[in-house]
Design a protein with these regions (language model features):
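NTP/phosphate- and nucleic-acid-binding module
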Residues: 1-383
């Protein structure tokens, strides 16, 4: 067993044993990629989210908080491009019928050979060639007989309505951003903000992804903390704002005790970048399984607002109060995954001192800041 795998298993065991995280629906055999947060996990997650809200919303006069609905008009997702571009490439083993994410399958194969390889952004034909030429085995049965890679939507579909024949298609939101974009005009009309300003929120999102063995790193539902920062591209350079938030994100996570040497920025390639982004960078943390994304920072330009103007017919332009000029602002988007911060802090804080397991957490995020224990003579680890 690799040392990294061993550390991951120790963290998973600690989380269940001490009431941080439990497997979802465990008494019924569980449901893959779902987890429930226990008493200590809830306290720690609340601390993380409260710290984020205080730092990026409460203490600032230029960012306004929102709490938008999980369900929105399906036209929102059509306009944003998610119904056509928010996909995952999957591949099936013909022998055992196991369905696997093609990108993750390829990357895990090369990682097992201690080779770095990114499959993101590869075409379906390229991924098929990589799987076949390397004879990549199925992680379940070991066979190398695969179907062709195919694209599947990451949006969870659902039906709204009581009468079966009148039910209509809808989606669970796949990101927080669209709820903020469609409320842009409401905030302009009610708050009269001046550029640059942001709209931020904390909320659950849902992604129909095929994952396995990643604990809370990648799940079917998770909580994001995110804001859209609007600015006039004719007045401010996007590079300057991008760099500003890049530093703010880095400084915030290191303020919670995460060492700088366990963090690195990684730029998305043109093939990897999302359909709405001109530039995306991930702040990676060195998890037990290696460096993986913890935060994301994207320059979404005016893509989303323009798409919603085109689809809805609403006027989502900003009018400069001094010049009277109307224009569509550009957007920089910092995104924070609370469950990944949670896992990063546990990974960084996990220590073994002899036979004792110690979790060294910054007091700002620790579930308990002070604990009083009785003196029990037969409990040497306490006495």
């Amino acid at each position: 067993m690799k040392e990294t795998d061993n550390l991951q298993q120790k963290i998973v065991s600690l989380c269940k044993r001490r009431g941080f995280v439990y497997p979802g629906s465990e008494i019924y055999g569980g449901l893959a990629n779902t987890y429930d947060y226990g008493p200590l996990g809830v306290l720690m997650m609340r601390n993380i989210q409260n710290l984020w809200w205080e730092n990026f919303i409460t203490k600032r006069s230029d960012i306004y908080g929102l709490d938008t609905a999980v369900f929105m008009s399906p036209d929102v997702w059509v306009a944003s491009g998610h119904t056509t571009s928010f996909n995952e490439v999957l591949i099936d083993c013909k022998n055992c019928k196991q369905r696997t994410g093609a990108e993750k399958l390829i990357e895990a194969f090369f990682e097992s050979k201690d080779e770095k390889f990114s499959a993101e952004g590869r075409s379906l034909d390229e991924m098929e060639e990589i799987v076949q030429s390397n004879k990549i085995p199925c992680p379940e049965c070991g066979k190398t007989d695969w179907t062709k890679p195919r694209k599947f939507s990451n949006l969870f579909e659902t039906q709204i309505g009581i009468v079966p024949e009148n039910k209509s298609l809808n989606y669970l939101r796949g990101e927080l951003a669209q709820g903020m974009f469609v409320n842009f005009k409401n905030v302009l009309d009610s708050q009269r903000p001046k550029l640059p300003f942001g709209l931020g929120q904390i909320g659950k999102v849902f992604r129909n992804e095929i994952t396995k063995g990643n604990f809370v790193f990648r799940t079917l539902e998770f909580t994001l903390m995110e804001f859209e920062y609007f600015f006039n591209p004719n007045v401010q350079k996007w590079e300057d704002i991008f760099e500003y938030w890049r530093k703010e994100m880095f400084d915030w996570i290191t303020s919670m005790g995460v060492p700088k040497e366990k963090l690195r920025w990684r730029v998305h390639s043109d093939e990897e970048r999302a359909h709405y982004s001109k530039r995306t960078e991930d702040l990676d943390f060195e998890f037990a399984v290696g460096f993986k994304e913890m935060f994301g920072l994207a320059y979404r330009t005016d893509f989303d607002l323009n798409k919603h103007i085109e689809k809805s017919g609403a006027d989502l332009r900003y009018m400069d109060p001094e010049t009277g000029e109307k224009f569509v602002p550009h957007v920089i988007e910092p995104t924070f995954g609370s469950s990944r911060i949670f896992l990063a802090l546990l990974t960084n804080g996990y220590k073994e001192e002899g036979d004792r397991v110690v979790l060294k957490l910054d007091k700002k995020v620790a579930p308990y800041r002070v604990a009083v224990f009785p003196l029990v003579k037969n409990k040497e680890d306490i006495v």
